[in-house]
């Protein structure tokens, strides 16, 4: 068992001291970026980006990754895992060689694009070339960028596989494969695409998996393509985010959820909020109904054109829009710091999605409130979530506005 963590301070600082990591024997805790053996021009980029001290997961995972080890790193949203990936990749890549050397796969276009942005920012002084290879964007642009030469591809499995099969994305120089949100990638529909990509990669390959939740069956699967991985794990019981107050509102019927939501709008002053529905159709229906009742909301789901999704994300990220209604496409790892309230209009279809949704409301230690709308038949799901995460979800108090 590794020692308790040292907290990171700086923009979006998180108090890490309550996180306890279960790590492989011999994993060092490196308390400063300067001690990691990172090149000077990369350090400049890290500090320019606003980091002062590594987060708990960064303190443990960066050194094994840049040393060439296979790594399974479990870290919840908001612990700095995207910047950990970016930092490690920037250190490993030889920028003098204009070939793809690292491939990062993510379950959503938005997460892949965010990884590209963070890596370009951190790697600014080393002139790293990164391309987000994602569906919904022009194949012609992918072909142009890849033929011009990039060091890193951050992409979604479908588009990356397509580019490899077209022989536009050449894999001969790839030495590092990173699967971000590995539970989503391997456990829920992406497994075949991952294996398709993996078959085209060189045999001497370093593989890293990073995710907020790593169920037992996912860990078993890693034995197929990882060699003696270093494990850096958060105890499951501690995956509930500190500082997030979780409540439920009992609603007798589905129709009552809408009235409850309107009541909350009247009583809460919200900086920014995300409302989750389980289906795209429900997102469209709720958005239309809210707007017809003179509430200003934006909406996003996977059927929308990529350009429209980018515009909506940009507006929400900048604070131009305050309330976003969405499906779980938004729930995994997207970095919008101002979100103070998450409403689960529908409880998620599985308990592991719950933490990805709730993680939105308290990133890097920001306090947050999560409110779950619960019908009678949902009580069992709610209790299952409570038990799984060893947490307590209380009935929403009258003074909930004071907690946001």
Swiss-Prot record:
Record-level GO BP terms: mRNA splicing, via spliceosome; mRNA transport; nuclear-transcribed mRNA catabolic process, nonsense-mediated decay; regulation of translation
Motif Q motif: positions: 31-59
Position of sequence motif DEAD box: 180-183
Keywords linked to the UniProt accession: ATP-binding, Cytoplasm, Helicase, Hydrolase, mRNA processing, mRNA splicing, mRNA transport, Nonsense-mediated mRNA decay, Nucleotide-binding, Nucleus, RNA-binding, Translation regulation, Transport
Domain Helicase C-terminal: 243-404
Localization, UniProt: Nucleus; Cytoplasm
SMART domains referenced in this protein's UniProt entry, alphabetically: DEXDc (SM00487), HELICc (SM00490)
Tissue: Expressed in roots, leaves, flowers and seeds.
The organism's place on the tree of life at top rank: Eukaryota
Ranges of residues in domain Helicase ATP-binding: 62-232
EC number: 3.6.4.13
Molecular function, one GO term: ATP hydrolysis activity
GO cellular component: catalytic step 2 spliceosome; cytoplasm; nucleolus
Region (Disordered): 1-20
Binding sites annotated in the UniProt record for ATP: 75-82
A Pfam family annotated for this UniProt entry: Helicase_C
Enzyme class, UniProt record, top EC level: hydrolase
PROSITE patterns: DEAD_ATP_HELICASE (PS00039), HELICASE_ATP_BIND_1 (PS51192), HELICASE_CTER (PS51194), Q_MOTIF (PS51195)
Family from the record: Belongs to the DEAD box helicase family. DDX48/FAL1 subfamily.
Function comment: ATP-dependent RNA helicase. Core component of the splicing-dependent multiprotein exon junction complex (EJC) deposited at splice junctions on mRNAs. The EJC is a dynamic structure consisting of core proteins and several peripheral nuclear and cytoplasmic associated factors that join the complex only transiently either during EJC assembly or during subsequent mRNA metabolism.
Assembly and oligomerization: Interacts with MAGO1 and Y14B.
The protein's name in its UniProt record: Eukaryotic initiation factor 4A-III homolog A
Protein species of origin: Oryza sativa subsp. japonica
